Amino acid sequence: MLKYSINRPITNVVVFGCGGTGSRTVPLLAQLLTSHEFTKNVRLVLVDGDVVEEKNCKRQHFIKQEIDRNKAEVLARRYRLGFEARTEAVPFFVPSVEEQMKYLRGFTKPSEMGVVQDATRGFFKAFSECFSPAGMDQSVFLSPETFESSAARNGNVKGQLSNTLFSNTSVFIMCVDSVDARKRIMTLIQTLGYMFGVQSRDAFPNMIVIDSGNEDIF
C-alpha cells in the first residue's frame, strides 16, 4: 500500500525522457496515482523534446498514428484522457544535469532536494554539488532491489533506515530501462510505506523525479 504524509504529501512527479523507458514508465505511474484517493491530484509532468519516429513504434510505447508528434505531449494526452491523470507536457529537451537542476528549481528549493539513485559517481557528484551543500552524506542511495541495501550503504544495520533518509522533500530516481524503472518505483513505494510507521510525517517527500532519458550524459 502506498502511504504518505498528511502534512507533506507528494504533489509532483516529474519524468525526464519519454522514450524507451519513459513511455513504459508513465502508464504505470498514471495508473498508480489515479488509483488512490490521496494521490489522484498529484501532477505528472512529462519532459521530452523528441518526436515519435517510425522506428520508435517497434520498442517504445507509441503507435504509427502518433508519428511526428511530440512524445511528452502524446503521453500526457493519452493518460489524461485514459486515466484522468493530471498530466502536463514540457515539449523540449533538457540536455544536461545542470539544465535539469534549473528546471526542478521551479518546483522546490535547492536545499530541499533529495536524491534517490544508483547511477555513476560522476552524476551523483554533479547532483550533490547542485543540491547538497554538505556533500554526499546529505543525499540518499536506493538500489533497485531492496531498501535494506540502501541502509547498508549508509552505515546502518540491515533493515533499519536512517533518520536522514527521505529527510528532504523530493526524491530523484534514475532508471536505465523499463524493468529497472518498475523495480525502483515499487521499492520507493515499499520504503515510503515502511517509513510511515517509523518516521515523522514531515520526513516524507512531496515530489518524485524520474530520469528515464539523457543517458548520454552519465
How would you describe each model-predicted region?
Residues 1-218:
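Adenine nucleotide-associated cytosolic modules
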